[in-house]
């Protein structure tokens, strides 16, 4: 009985493998693509809308049946065609301002994609969303259920929820672009991963982050956000976005090094092959070696980045020709920039050097890394709402230099929650001359910015920062334009002995609780320097 049971249970698997046949099946309404892969993958694309309406992998239907997978919220209508050329199938979806491609290589359980645009979509963001069966694919990777909102009650807008006493949001699935080469959703028998080979036409730079996944109950969403208005810090880029790849597997997590160079032979709009690109090599120096160093290249058409080696040496990704701003970061804090010109088929050598420049420091809170790392609740803010019961109390806080820990200083100040923050420090008689209080921030909301009072002296009201028109801290963001505020302190203001600084959030706007005007602390938040 055992051997008979084993034989019959293996027969469907054998049949599935044997039936895999690479090709296109065409009907009046759709194209069905068979990848010809050992673990069979078939998917169906609507000929009228470009929606994926079915994804059958290893005998299971993974596509959510009530709504398709698509660009944006769906193209609505498009001119859709499909061609097979040897070992490759290409589906092309055309609108007036957008062309989307699905590409399959014979034998691979992968849907490769690329999206070419000449204008930003009317919804104000460019994304691909795969709406997949949440019963078969309930899990989100790598951050788990922080973005599983199924069964929750909305507590902020329509995108932050309370689920079993924990705050959750699709925004809490985000990862910095420089670290996000793969994100996945999975179940006991299937895994689907988005593999990101190319961010060159996206926006925001290496430290930008956006939504990656969201199990909302009816379906589990796997995204690639190419651009959006979510803490948007630079203009959108046109041209070809991608290639990017949706990889299907049974249990293993695929690697991120996927060769898509075959796109060069498939007549893909805007695709620049390796032969049409160049690189930049060099050495970075001068920044604090306690932090990772990043080199970043950007212009209106493209962006690239890389971590340096431990000795500062670097080689850029293959870049499109052009002249680029070249920036150098200590952590996420920019310490230098220059320009460099890249030519096709050649490597350009360009070194870069820079460091944090300060005067004689009386005290500082935190490190010059462009992040709120180490401050109160910074270890939780990426993955939960500030109101979450797992957060430590936001204060108001009194911080005493020399005895308080950096971890007791709030990573963000909210006008209606924990403003002001009070700092006490002791000065010697030699430190009572003119000084500068430098307050570094990474992100502002609703015009929130710091105004400082040192003993009886109140510094000037700073101008309002650029309005990014996007919720930040409550949706797991901390990086915006990075305003730094210097407050000149007249001689005699600081006294020998105990001194008190209070920093208030000021703004012409108002709001409740964590949606009141606020800013994120970093750089460090505060350095007191002798002039």
From Swiss-Prot:
InterPro entries: Carb-bd-like_fold, Gal_mutarotase_sf_dom, Galactose-bd-like_sf, GH-type_carb-bd, RG-lyase_II, RG-lyase_III, Rhamnogalacturonase_B, RhgB_N. Pfam families: CBM-like, fn3_3, RhgB_N. GO terms for biological process: cell wall organization; pectin catabolic process. GO terms for cellular component: extracellular region. Disulfide bonds join 50-93, 184-193. Its EC number is 4.2.2.23. It comes from the Eukaryota. It is found in: Secreted. Glycans are attached at residue 351. One of its GO terms (molecular function) is rhamnogalacturonan endolyase activity. Residues 1-20 form the signal peptide. Coiled coil: none annotated. CDD domains: RGL4_C (cd10317), RGL4_M (cd10316), RGL4_N (cd10320). Keywords: Carbohydrate metabolism, Cell wall biogenesis/degradation, Disulfide bond, Glycoprotein, Lyase, Polysaccharide degradation, Secreted, Signal. Gene3D superfamilies: 2.70.98.10, Carboxypeptidase-like, regulatory domain (2.60.40.1120), Galactose-binding domain-like (2.60.120.260). It catalyses: Endotype eliminative cleavage of L-alpha-rhamnopyranosyl-(1->4)-alpha-D-galactopyranosyluronic acid bonds of rhamnogalacturonan I domains in ramified hairy regions of pectin leaving L-rhamnopyranose at the reducing end and 4-deoxy-4,5-unsaturated D-galactopyranosyluronic acid at the non-reducing end. Pectinolytic enzymes consist of four classes of enzymes: pectin lyase, polygalacturonase, pectin methylesterase and rhamnogalacturonase. Degrades the rhamnogalacturonan I (RG-I) backbone of pectin. Belongs to the polysaccharide lyase 4 family. This is Probable rhamnogalacturonate lyase A. It comes from Aspergillus terreus (strain NIH 2624 / FGSC A1156). The gene is rglA.
């Amino acid at each position: 009985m055992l051997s008979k049971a084993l034989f019959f249970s293996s027969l469907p698997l054998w049949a599935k493998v044997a039936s895999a046949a690479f090709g296109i099946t065409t009907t009046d309404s759709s194209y069905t693509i068979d990848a010809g892969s050992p673990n069979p993958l078939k998917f169906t694309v609507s000929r009228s809308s470009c929606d994926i309406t079915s994804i059958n992998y290893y005998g299971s239907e993974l596509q959510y049946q009530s709504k398709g997978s698509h660009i944006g919220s769906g193209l609505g209508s498009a001119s859709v065609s499909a061609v097979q050329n040897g070992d490759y199938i290409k589906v092309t979806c055309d609108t007036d301002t957008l062309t989307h491609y699905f590409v399959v290589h014979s034998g691979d359980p992968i849907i490769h994609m690329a999206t070419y645009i000449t204008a930003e979509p009317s919804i104000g963001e460019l994304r691909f969303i795969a709406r997949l069966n949440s019963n078969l694919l309930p899990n989100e990777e790598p951050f788990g259920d922080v973005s599983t909102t199924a069964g929750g009650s909305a507590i902020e807008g329509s995108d932050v929820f309370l689920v079993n006493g924990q705050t959750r949001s699709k925004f809490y699935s985000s990862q910095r672009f420089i670290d996000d080469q793969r994100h996945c959703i999975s179940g006991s028998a299937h895994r689907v991963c988005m593999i990101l080979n190319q961010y060159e036409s996206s926006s925001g730079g290496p430290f930008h982050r956006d939504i990656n996944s969201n199990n909302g109950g009816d379906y589990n969403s796997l995204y690639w956000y190419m651009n959006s208005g979510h803490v948007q810090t630079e203009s959108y880029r046109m041209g070809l976005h991608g290639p990017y790849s949706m990889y299907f597997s049974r249990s293993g997590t695929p690697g991120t090094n996927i060769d898509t160079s075959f796109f060069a032979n498939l007549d893909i709009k805007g695709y620049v092959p390796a032969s049409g690109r160049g690189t930049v090599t060099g050495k970075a120096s001068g920044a604090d070696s306690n932090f990772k160093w990043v080199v970043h290249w950007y212009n209106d058409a493209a962006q690239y980045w890389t971590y340096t080696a431990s000795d500062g040496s670097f080689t850029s990704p293959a870049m499109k020709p052009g002249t680029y701003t070249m920036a150098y970061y200590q952590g996420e804090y920019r310490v230098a920039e220059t320009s460099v010109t890249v030519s096709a088929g050649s490597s350009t050598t360009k070194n870069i050097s820079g460091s944090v420049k300060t005067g004689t420091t009386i005290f500082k809170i935190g490190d010059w890394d462009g992040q709120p790392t180490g401050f109160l609740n910074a270890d939780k803010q990426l993955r939960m709402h500030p109101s979450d019961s797992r957060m430590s109390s936001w204060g108001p806080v009194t911080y005493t230099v020399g005895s308080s820990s950096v971890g007791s200083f709030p990573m963000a100040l909210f006008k209606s929650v924990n403003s002001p923050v009070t700092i006490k420090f002791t000065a010697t008689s030699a430190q009572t001359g003119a000084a500068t209080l430098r307050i570094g921030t990474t992100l502002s909301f609703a015009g929130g910015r710091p105004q400082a009072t040192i003993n009886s002296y109140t510094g000037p009201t700073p101008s309002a920062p650029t309005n990014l028109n996007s919720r930040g801290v409550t949706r797991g963001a901390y990086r915006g334009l990075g305003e730094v505020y210097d407050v000149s302190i007249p001689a005699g203001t600081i006294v020998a002995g105990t001194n008190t600084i209070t920093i208030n959030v000021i703004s012409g706007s108002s709001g409740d609780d964590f949606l009141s005007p606020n800013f994120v602390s970093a750089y460090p938040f505060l350095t007191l320097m002798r002039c």
